[in-house]
């Protein structure tokens, strides 16, 4: 049997890049909650004892940026310099301006345009992907890596493994076979977990606890065998972490946010962007399209691309490929997608309810992946049943 290995990684909410994604999206949530028409392009960077937020925000909302930064860092677990950042005593720098009026008139007509006339906030191309290898219709490598990361955070916060600290990374290698273009996972080949820890714990205890409390509850037993390789904190020491260990920046984990290296990526990040930014809204609608194709039984695997020009509502192109797994020709699937999904940015915002912020709606997306999550706030995960036209 011809098989191959494929690997995906994830990082925890305490990873400095992910900390920045969460701060940017917490600010987006705060703006949209008070003013659904907020225009937000918010970047965050961090290093030892410092978090800076900067970018362009036009909103009627009254937002305390410093409080949001500190609350987000504290919620992750950065409560002292020992763990990598002290949320209450670190420096918080804010450099936020209004959106350029040139962009505003071209995209929104200064709020005079109807939703269907609102132009894309920028040029770009985005991809959506779906595969029938998991119930989430997501790649197994990505699902396992992100769930391991989420479980690490869970056992840290609930006290099961008190030696854990917020920063951490996971990586999963799966052996697959290609079944006529569809991906069939056979077994987990390698599991890698590197987690920040305190000074008190031994490497033996780390390995034992990770196997018992993190790996065993997450990876289905049918995928593990006596050949599975485990690398558990292979560097031997990971006490210094978070922004103390590495600098962090919004938008540096775009593959973790999406499909773990499967499918394709147009390069645009999600966090800190309101829905007029097609980097985000375009990627969400093509995920819904690809997922709906697979969930409707029209293909076992599907990728959809959409592209935009700044200020233009209609997409420049829509592309679909089912990797030869389609039950009907790809051109017919493309016609169904165009008929059932409105790719104009103003209509994506309405149909996926993307102007609704607050209650951690977008902050939740900023750790452990934007897709394949079972949460009503992830409106783009809702399947539309697609039925081929009868000849």
From Swiss-Prot:
InterPro entries: ADOMET_SYNTHASE_CS, S-AdoMet_synt_C, S-AdoMet_synt_central, S-AdoMet_synt_N, S-AdoMet_synthetase, S-AdoMet_synthetase_sfam. Keywords: ATP-binding, Cobalt, Cytoplasm, Magnesium, Metal-binding, Nucleotide-binding, One-carbon metabolism, Potassium, Transferase. Pfam families: S-AdoMet_synt_C, S-AdoMet_synt_M, S-AdoMet_synt_N. Belongs to the AdoMet synthase family. Its cofactor is Mn(2+); Mg(2+); Co(2+); K(+). It is found in: Cytoplasm. Pathway: Amino-acid biosynthesis; S-adenosyl-L-methionine biosynthesis; S-adenosyl-L-methionine from L-methionine: step 1/1. SUPFAM superfamilies: S-adenosylmethionine synthetase. ATP binds at residues 15, 167-169, 235-238, 246, 252-253, 269, 273, 277. This is S-adenosylmethionine synthase 1. GO terms for molecular function: ATP binding; metal ion binding; methionine adenosyltransferase activity. Its main location: cytoplasm. The gene is METK1. K(+) binds at residue 43. Catalyzes the formation of S-adenosylmethionine from methionine and ATP. The reaction comprises two steps that are both catalyzed by the same enzyme: formation of S-adenosylmethionine (AdoMet) and triphosphate, and subsequent hydrolysis of the triphosphate.
């Amino acid at each position: 049997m011809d098989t191959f290995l494929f690997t995906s990684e994830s990082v925890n909410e305490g990873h400095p890049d992910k900390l920045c994604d969460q701060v940017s999206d917490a600010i987006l949530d705060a703006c949209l909650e008070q003013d659904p028409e907020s225009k937000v392009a918010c970047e965050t960077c961090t290093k030892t004892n410092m978090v800076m937020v900067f970018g362009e925000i036009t909103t009627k909302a009254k937002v305390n940026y410093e409080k949001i930064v500190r609350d987000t860092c504290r919620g992750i677990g950065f409560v002292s310099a020992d763990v990598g950042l002290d949320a209450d005593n670190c420096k918080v720098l804010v450099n936020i301006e209004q959106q350029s009026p040139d962009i505003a008139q071209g995209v929104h007509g200064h709020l005079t345009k109807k939703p269907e006339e609102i132009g894309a906030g920028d040029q770009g191309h985005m991809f959506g992907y779906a595969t029938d290898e998991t119930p989430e219709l997501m790649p197994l490598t990505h699902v396992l890596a992100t769930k391991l990361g989420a479980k690490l955070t869970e056992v840290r916060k609930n006290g099961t493994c008190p030696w854990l600290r917020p920063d951490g990374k996971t990586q999963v290698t799966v052996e697959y076979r290609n079944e006529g273009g569809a991906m069939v996972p056979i077994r987990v080949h390698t599991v890698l977990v590197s987690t920040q820890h305190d000074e008190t714990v031994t490497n033996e205890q780390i390995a034992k606890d990770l196997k018992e409390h993190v790996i065993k509850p997450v990876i289905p037993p049918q995928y593990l065998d006596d050949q599975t390789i485990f690398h558990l904190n292979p560097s031997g020491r990971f006490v210094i972490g978070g922004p103390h260990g590495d600098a962090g920046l919004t938008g540096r984990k775009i593959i973790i946010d999406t499909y773990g290296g499967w499918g394709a990526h147009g390069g645009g990040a999600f966090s800190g962007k309101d829905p007029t930014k097609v980097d985000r809204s375009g990627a969400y609608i093509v995920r819904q399209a690809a997922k709906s194709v697979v969930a409707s039984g029209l293909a076992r695997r599907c990728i959809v691309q959409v592209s935009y020009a700044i200020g233009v509502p209609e997409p420049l192109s829509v592309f679909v490929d089912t990797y030869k797994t389609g039950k009907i020709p790809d051109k017919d699937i493309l016609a169904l997608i165009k008929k059932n999904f409105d790719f104009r940015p103003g209509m994506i915002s309405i149909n996926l309810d993307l102007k609704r912020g607050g209650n951690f709606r977008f902050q939740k997306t900023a750790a452990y992946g934007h897709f394949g999550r079972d949460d009503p706030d992830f409106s783009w995960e809702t399947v539309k049943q697609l039925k081929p036209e009868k000849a």
